[in-house]
Amino acid sequence: MQQLTMGQAVNQALREEMLRDFNVFIAGEGVGVSIHDNPLMPTAGLLKDFGPERVKDTPVSEAAIAGLAVGSSVMGLRPVVEIMFNPFVTIASDMIVNHAAKLRYLSGGKSTFPLVVRMKSGAGFGAGCQHSHNLEAWMAHCPGLKVVMPGTPADAKGLLKSAIRDDNPVVFIEDMMLYFIPGPVPEEEYTIPIGKADVKRVGSDVSIVSWSKMVGVALKGAQILAENGVDAEVVDLRTLLPLDRETLLTSVRKTGRLVVLHEATRTGGFAGEICAIVAEDALNSLKAPFRRVTGPDIPVPFSPPLERFYIPDENNLVEAVLGIM
Amino acid sequence: MPRKAINLTCKVEYLSILDETGKLDKKLDPSIPDDLLLRLYRAMLLARRFDERMLVLQRQGKIGTFAPIKGQEAQVGAAAVLEPGDWLVPSFREMPSELWRGKSMESVLFTYGGYNEGGYIPEGINNLPVSIPVGSQTLHAVGLGYAMKYRGDKSVAMVFFGDGATSEGDFHEAMNFAAVFRTPTVFMCQNNHWAISVPRSRQSHSKTLAQKALAYDMPGIQLDGNDVLAVYAGAKEAVDRARSGGGPTLIELVTYRMSMHTTADDPKKYRSEKEVEEWEKRDPIVRFEKYLRGRNLLTDAGVEEMDEDVRNEVREAEERWLEQIGKGVDPLDMFDHAYAEMPPSLRAQKEELERELSEKKR
Ligand SMILES: Cc1ncc(C[n+]2csc(CCOP(=O)(O)OP(=O)(O)O)c2C)c(N)n1
Ligand SMILES: [Mg+2]
């Protein structure tokens, strides 16, 4: 199997879908001519291969970028637009939250908006809270959207291809730290269905539920737990909206314990939703209270050493798990 | 009814006072006192040297990514027009203006060295912190201006932003509010010809950025942004107008980003060396120095002495900074300042980390 980073996997997905369907085009700030002449970045080389009409560098205008996606998608194009960093989605949010998410409903199902908004997220590169702010729970609070947050290169590729083919607006969130970590990606054509979680490690003692960059942390934590005699199951949600309740509940009913791990801040974070579902539908299976391991309720600190304390790590996870064993 | 023209006064001027050889257009001389001229020169030199030093520190891994200002030092001419009670609202390329207004170099190093202290605004200095979301700070400057009017104080808010920022809706909403409410806001657009890898020509179809003022019926002017005298003169006109109740102005400083967008990129990948060389001929410091030498305000010895002096100042600031950070950071500090009073839920999270850290120590 080929070894690709998530950046390369996203790049392959974009390439393949652009070749497959002329309606697919890309727009965003620096998606064509980039300052990063780095083959590991998701849109590297696409301008050269597909030309400036299909790979559009835009002015600095997030609302217009998202609006371009809304308007062009109703005409049947399949835009894949990029918001450079997650916090800047606030500027594009009218288009995404009030329009992309709602116009199908308002049109009585007549109009479809097959668009993808890709955005880079994640702390860990010392750029402070106005660059790093994981807002997936905001997005997941918007009916009409699909919210995808892959944790491995292979998932990113298969899910992005599905997102591009999906007739609904999909918010596709990529953690930048994953751009540079290689992983196996199948050579042959494949897609991964949106709305399907994946059990990344089978275990019997506790369900660790996570997504995006934290899946890697969960797997590391599971390794340490194994050395301590705890057999953890790692459930990678991959899609937050629509949520795969079945995989979640099956796992928790089996293990009887739940720890949710995400990088975003705790209060109002998506872990709350997971815990609520489990409390509603699997409370009787729980042998111990569930736990959340998350970033604290503060903006991401600028300082790299402080940032390391901010981002949950495998030790935080192990401690939380051991606390309910 | 036949079509008829609507009478609009549309005018956009370009003002340059010192040409590339340092020759002064006497008719336009803003008559800046000699000591202020020398202070402006020193501030530009300090900014250049500090910028160079930060690049070295970044390459050594001592500070993180930052946005170099090389070539845009003449902005201090605008900051120099402000009174202490006025407000400076920077983006991320206004280090020279921030220093002029009293921010310390240590504090800049704190910011890019990754310490929250960098955003701290010392008592009595009316600067807002660096703003990362492009163009957003233009709106703050309207709010500041609104408050000034509300309180009846005669202050002014000057907001800096780039050519790229004029593509954001925020900029247009800010301009409209400022014009409708007639706030004492000066919009200072540093057109450095690039927004990361997008050239000015592909950022806006408008011939000038200054002309965007016309749509909001406020004065707009283009200044030679590499000529500190023009920057000073144009900014003074706008600040005086704002202070006397005449409302906002849009100023476009035509300048050039001689260095990289941030230390994370290599501009050679997307722009020609020739373009950079053309702009190097218009270096704002070289030009101003020629002028000052011509007027005998600077001599060879004087320049050398000042450069030495400036380098020392940079070195001393760096030493103070190193000493400060040598004391280390307390992870618990990251919980401070998020709220005026720490909410109980956050206190609990802080205590959780405190426990964890003390357990680790044991
Ligand atoms: C809202 C927002 N979108 C995108 C970015 C990423 N970004 C940082 S600087 C920049 C270009 C800004 O260009 P300009 O306004 O000309 O300022 P300059 O960097 O040239 O000083 C962009 C797109 C950002 N910081 N904020
Ligand atoms: Mg610019």
Where are the predicted features?
Chain B
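A residue-level signal for beta-strand positions that form part of recognition/binding surfaces
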Residues: 14, 85, 248
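Structural signal for conserved beta-strand scaffold positions within catalytic alpha/beta enzyme cores
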Residues: 19, 90, 222-224
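Short, histidine-centered active-site or binding-site loop motifs used for metal coordination
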Residues: 21, 92-94, 189-192
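Cofactor-binding active-site loop characterized by glycine-rich and histidine/acidic residues
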Residues: 49-52, 56-183, 199-205, 210, ...
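Short, well-ordered beta-to-alpha junction loops that form the rim of enzyme active sites
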Residues: 92-93, 253-255, 326-328
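Glycine-rich ThDP/TPP pyrophosphate-binding loop and its adjacent helix/strand module
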Residues: 135-323
